[in-house]
Amino acid sequence: MLDVAIIGCGVVGAAAAYELSHYPLHTAIFEAENDVADCTTKANSAILHAGYDPEPGTRMARLNVEGVALAKEICARLDVPYRQCGSLVLALSPEELPHLQKLYENGIANGVPGIRLLSAEETLAMEPNLAPTVVGALYAPSAAIVSPWEYALAMTEVAVRNGVELRRSCRVEDAEAMADGGYRLTTTQGTVEARYVINAAGIWAEKVHCMVEPASFHITPTRGEYYLLDKSEGTRVNHVIFQCPNELGKGVLVSPTVHGNLIVGPDAVPVHGDDTSCTSKGLEFVKTTAQRSVPSINFGESIRNFAGVRANLDVDDFIIGEEPEAPGWIDL
C-alpha cells in the first residue's frame, strides 16, 4: 500500500511530491498525460504574484506572500530560471485610482514588501513605453517571473531521485474509500491502494473529488489565449504590466519572460474540458486590450500563439485540506 498517492503532476502535484520526498514515505504520482507539466502548468502567464489582490485573512493572501519568497529559494536551489522583476498595476483613467488604493490597502494588510502607489510621472519613468494616458500605478517589487514547466520538471526530478514513483499516461478513473481507511484507486495501469490521496488534478479536480463524494466546490475551466513575441520585443517592458483586475481575473498582461521574450495575454473564456484552441476573436481581444497599456508593442514579431486552460473556482480562495466526509483525501 502507498502512503500517499498524488493525482496530477502539474506544478502543484510536483511541489507536493517534492516536499513529501524528503520524508520516509512510499509516494507515487499518477499523471494522466504522457509527461509532467503538460496541462495548465505549461500554458500560463508564468507570474509569481506579490499578494496584494487577495482579501486579507484568506489562505491566498498569506500564501501568495509566503509562496513568492519560497519559490525564489527553491528556484535557486534547483537552478530554475527566475527573475524578480516586480509588477505594476496600471490605472488608465481617474476612475480606476480608487481600485489601486484598495489593492494597496490589501497589500499592506497582507504584508507585501515594498508595495507603493506611484504617480503618472513615476510610472512612466519606470516604464516609458506605457500609454501616455496612464494616471498612476501600484508597484509591487516582490512579484516575479519563472519558467513554470522547468519549475515543475525540476521538482519532479528531485522527487523521483528521492524515491517517489512517477506513473505517466496513468489516468485515475475511479476512487473509493476502504472500510479500514485509505482509498482504492482504479487507474488505466491497474488498481492501487493508498493511505492518503492528494488531489492535484487541476481543471479535473472537481471531477476527481466526486469519485469519493460530492464536491463542495465547483470549477469552471477557463481558456486564456496568448501571444509570445520574439526576443526583439523582450525589453519593451521591464516589469509585469497588469491592468486593473475585474471579475474575470487580472486582465490582459504584458510581461517579459525569463527567456527574454515578451508574453501578452490572456483573455478569459469559459470552456468545456481542456479546449486549448486559439481563436481570431480571442487573439484580437488580447491584442487590442494590451495596446491600451503598451501601445507600441509590435505584434508583427509574434512567434507563437497558444492557449491554456485554468481552473476558476466558485470561491475566492485556495482549497487546501480534507473534508470531514473524506478523511485522508486532500484537495489542492
Regions flagged by a language model, labelled:
Residues 213, 225, 231-262, 268, ...:
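Mid-domain catalytic core of redox enzymes
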Residues 199-214:
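Flavin (primarily FAD) binding-site architecture
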Residues 138-196:
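Helical element adjacent to the flavin cofactor pocket in flavoenzyme catalytic cores
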Residues 249, 258-259, 274-332:
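C-terminal catalytic lobe of FAD-dependent flavoproteins
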